[in-house]
Amino acid sequence: MLARALLLCAAVALSHAANPCCSNPCQNRGVCMTMGFDQYKCDCTRTGFYGENCSTPEFLTRIKLLLKPTPDTVHYILTHFKGVWNIVNSIPFLRNSIMKYVLTSRSHMIDSPPTYNVHYNYKSWEAFSNLSYYTRALPPVADDCPTPMGVKGKKELPDSKDVVEKLLLRRKFIPDPQGTNMMFAFFAQHFTHQFFKTDLKRGPAFTKGLGHGVDLNHIYGETLDRQHKLRLFKDGKMKYQVIDGEVYPPTVKDTQVEMIYPPHIPAHLQFAVGQEVFGLVPGLMMYATIWLREHNRVCDVLKQEHPEWDDEQLFQTSRLILIGETIKIVIEDYVQHLSGYHFKLKFDPELLFNQQFQYQNRIAAEFNTLYHWHPLLPDTFQIDDQQYNYQQFLYNNSILLEHGLTQFVESFTRQIAGRVAGGRNVPPAVQKVAKASIDQSRQMKYQSLNEYRKRFLLKPYESFEELTGEKEMAAELEALYGDIDAVELYPALLVERPRPDAIFGESMVEMGAPFSLKGLMGNPICSPNYWKPSTFGGEVGFKIVNTASIQSLICNNVKGCPFTSFNVPDPQLTKTVTINASASHSRLEDINPTVLLKGRSTEL
């Protein structure tokens, strides 16, 4: 009797331990649902597939799969045949048709309304309605799975410090072959910190950015109280100060706005802006100053056009115009540069007016994680003829005043950024940030890279060498993880083989683009009821939005209208750059990377 009782207890224990959905049996976005303790059922509804595991394509799906080119093939076509694309770009019907396909095919890969969060790996009202969570592209790995990645890989994940040191840490600066510059790097950091605002007091799965999109709270403040402290309440403008004839943000002392500065920073250098962390580096404060000037400039334009408007209407309409400018710059300059396409991307909300499209957005935790592009950062920051290491650069707004915005723009336009994919290019100064990114990913129980590749319609990697494109890091990965299906998302994105002469690998682009375009085009100003001249104060305001570019933003707000773009002016610089090619560890004694982590999100 005792033996039978023990066997029964063992059977019950085993049945409870083995969640049948841990193996991710349901393919092609089928939903796995447990049926008792040891059975599962795949819900294949509207996937285009059927069968026990949603693995058999329906007739129309089979045809689509036969005709559909691979993402790498599409990328090759879009980045070659420049003469053909010049013709396509000059024919509005063709350009509009292709752009519409780009927008719909990408944005339809994002669930809207949102589905999961870190605490709900099944659909629930809480996961839908609670805006304080980041949503999830894939549900978290269940707590009762035998390994951290479900059923694949080792029982314990490798030490995150080992992962960083062996695979991610820079040995020597690797410049980006696409010619990405520091104007791009700081734009990316400034732009994304309006919606990547992790609430670390509650945990990495929570956000303080409740707008979940492009609302410019990094300019105006997340709360009404912060906004009011930053506003002048005259002619719609934001508070400012004039130093040597140039407009800069006001100080913390003058606004009583909470900012993060070390105690030793002089009061006159503690500038106050919408995002509390933007005092961290002068590159962020550069963009904060440019957008402050742009807001007040737009207010002047609207005031002349509408002398009858009060302060509130001037402020609110200027904010909508700046949102429009931001989205246009991001699509037509920022994403255009990242893509490397000869096809010219276009910001035109009307392309989606006859499509099924939801004008809402929820930021996904995975989008936040994949955007940790710390390899962009150089070893030192070159401004005019001076170089600054990290210790000299951090929390040092005096550099901005000393050099001025014109020199900043000219210098950052010339300075090349690092390559993100390919591994071993995270600067030593931010290695603790990279480690924290891995640790937080584990807290959120992300599935493996291959599961995310399947989620975004990519073929899973079959070997470590296929992932990295070389042997040394592939061997390190295998020693750390044991199974290609158990490699973590964040490290994999950074060690992935880059596309030819590109900044990213396939996974980063094919995952990031849907999140990005859905977030941009899902903004309310892109909806039919908003996208009209009256929303922006008439044709004058509408024109500001429709003619915006990174160059016009700089020309309108920086003395001398210095040339700028998101890539270094001379493509040959990517071959010959030596500014940052020194061995990174040679100046480690000058760097205090922990200052980046203390009391704030690792997103920086």
From Swiss-Prot:
Signal sequence, start to end: 1-17
O-acetylserine carried by residues: S565
Enzyme Commission no: 1.14.99.1
Listed GO biological process terms: brown fat cell differentiation; cellular response to fluid shear stress; cellular response to hypoxia; cellular response to non-ionic osmotic stress; cyclooxygenase pathway; decidualization; embryo implantation; negative regulation of intrinsic apoptotic signaling pathway in response to osmotic stress
Residues in EGF-like domain copies: 18-55
PTM per Swiss-Prot/TrEMBL: S-nitrosylation by NOS2 (iNOS) activates enzyme activity. S-nitrosylation may take place on different Cys residues in addition to Cys-526. Acetylated at Ser-565 by SPHK1. During neuroinflammation, acetylation by SPHK1 promotes neuronal secretion of specialized preresolving mediators (SPMs), especially 15-R-lipoxin A4, which results in an increase of phagocytic microglia.
Residues the entry annotates as binding substrate: R106, Y341
Membrane topology of the entry: Peripheral membrane protein
Disulphide bond pairs: C21-C32, C22-C145, C26-C42, C44-C54, C555-C561
InterPro entries in the record: EGF-like_dom (IPR000742), Haem_peroxidase_animal (IPR019791), Haem_peroxidase_sf (IPR010255), Haem_peroxidase_sf_animal (IPR037120), Oxylipin_biosynth_metab (IPR050783)
Main location per the UniProt record: membrane
Gene3D superfamilies in the cross-refs: Haem peroxidase domain superfamily, animal type (1.10.640.10), Laminin (2.10.25.10)
Coiled-coil ranges per UniProt: none
Cofactor: binding details: Binds 1 heme b (iron(II)-protoporphyrin IX) group per subunit.
Tissue and organ distribution: Highest expression in kidney and urinary bladder.
Reaction(s) catalysed by this chain's protein: (5Z,8Z,11Z,14Z)-eicosatetraenoate + AH2 + 2 O2 = prostaglandin H2 + A + H2O; (5Z,8Z,11Z,14Z)-eicosatetraenoate + 2 O2 = prostaglandin G2; prostaglandin G2 + AH2 = prostaglandin H2 + A + H2O; (5Z,8Z,11Z,14Z,17Z)-eicosapentaenoate + 2 O2 = prostaglandin G3
Glycoprotein among keywords: yes
Site feature: Aspirin-acetylated serine: S516
Residues forming the catalytic site: H193 (proton acceptor), Y371 (for cyclooxygenase activity)
Residues annotated as glycosylated: N53, N130, N396, N580
Subunit relationships: Homodimer.
Name of protein: Prostaglandin G/H synthase 2
The organism of origin for this protein: Oryctolagus cuniculus (Rabbit)
Higher taxonomy: Eukaryota, Metazoa, Chordata, Craniata, Vertebrata
